[in-house]
Curated annotation (Swiss-Prot):
Catalytic reaction equation(s): N(tele)-phospho-L-histidyl/L-threonyl-[pyruvate, phosphate dikinase] + ADP = N(tele)-phospho-L-histidyl/O-phospho-L-threonyl-[pyruvate, phosphate dikinase] + AMP + H(+); N(tele)-phospho-L-histidyl/O-phospho-L-threonyl-[pyruvate, phosphate dikinase] + phosphate + H(+) = N(tele)-phospho-L-histidyl/L-threonyl-[pyruvate, phosphate dikinase] + diphosphate
NCBIfam families per UniProt: PRK05339.1 (NF003742)
Stated family: Belongs to the pyruvate, phosphate/water dikinase regulatory protein family. PDRP subfamily.
Protein name: Putative pyruvate, phosphate dikinase regulatory protein
Binding site for ADP: 149-156
Enzyme Commission number(s) of this protein: 2.7.11.32, 2.7.4.27
GO molecular function: ADP binding; ATP binding; phosphotransferase activity, phosphate group as acceptor; protein serine/threonine kinase activity
Role noted for this protein: Bifunctional serine/threonine kinase and phosphorylase involved in the regulation of the pyruvate, phosphate dikinase (PPDK) by catalyzing its phosphorylation/dephosphorylation.
Keywords: Kinase, Nucleotide-binding, Serine/threonine-protein kinase, Transferase
Length: 273
């Protein structure tokens, strides 16, 4: 079995490059690819970090990057190292543009339906739904990522977004003065990420939620001191275990998920050395 290193470089989630790689390698039963994922590469600083990794582990590079400056830097680097650097859909886009007479506006996405990646995504979505809000804790070992945080810190939508990118994410709420699941006392080899938020912002979100549900009796849910303690306690739990913490106060769901994916793949790439 021939082993081959593949670097997947993308300004989004690397799923397009991953689809293409899986489909292509399905034609080579004697090749065992080792995939290194480099998602959300959107500036030269991040790209340079990836280039240093590629230099230390030579392999074929597949990329989907819209920014022309980043594309040029990547292809020039690979050319100098004499390693293949392939735009996953660049040839397709160029041919469509030539045939239609319409200039390229931006890089488009595409899918290979019903392949292994497709079904992995479905399984990840199913997992996220079944393990939402602290459910089925006995199956946490199957997760790629576990999110913890106070109520209304976007754990559920972030879990679903991660699932659409093929990652199994469970989420567990932290409630002040309530026992936290004992999994945190175990030596688990899983990525656990804490989500926190500015207390004032969290109170606004919770008040809007209570108004929507026409609930007026849950005072502790929007009490500043309690909300603040919840966020501080989550930070404390994570700091004690060297788990990363993300402040979602000014981040969209996509931005939060992208940061988590970067942490996840950096961790995975490190363990694959």
């Amino acid at each position: 079995m021939t082993k081959l290193i593949i670097h997947l470089v993308s300004d989004s989630s690397v799923q397009t490059a991953k689809y293409a790689a899986n489909s292509a390698f399905a034609q080579f039963t004697s090749i065992k690819p080792k995939l290194y994922h480099w998602p959300m590469i959107r500036n030269l600083e991040l790209l340079n970090e990836v280039l240093s990794k590629i230099e230390s582990k030579h392999g074929l590079v597949l990329y989907t990057i819209a920014d022309q400056e980043l594309r040029k830097a990547l292809t020039k680097f690979c050319y100098e190292l004499k390693i293949p650097c392939i735009s996953v859909i660049g040839k397709i886009i160029k041919e469509i543009s030539v045939f239609s007479g319409i200039e390229i506006e931006k890089e488009q996405n595409y899918n290979y339906k019903f392949d292994k990646t497709y079904f992995d995504t479905l399984n990840a979505i199913d997992y996220a739904i079944r393990h939402d809000d602290g459910q089925m804790l006995n199956e946490l070992s199957e997760a790629d990522i576990i999110l913890i945080g106070p109520s209304r810190t976007s754990k559920t939508p972030t879990s679903v977004f991660l699932a659409y990118n093929g990652l199994k994410a469970a989420n567990i709420p932290y409630v002040y003065n309530c026992p936290f699941p004992d999994f945190i006392e175990k030596d688990i080899d899983l990525l656990v990420v804490g989500l926190v938020i500015n207390p004032n912002r969290l109170i606004e979100i919770r008040e809007a939620r209570l108004n929507l549900l026409q609930i007026n009796e849950n005072k502790s849910y929007t009490d500043f001191n309690i909300v603040q303690k919840e966020c501080l306690e989550v930070r404390k739990i994570c700091d004690q275990r060297n788990w990363p913490v993300i402040d979602v106060s000014t981040r969209s769901i996509e931005e939060t998920a992208a940061l988590i994916m970067r942490i996840y793949y950096n961790r995975k790439n490190k363990y694959n050395k």
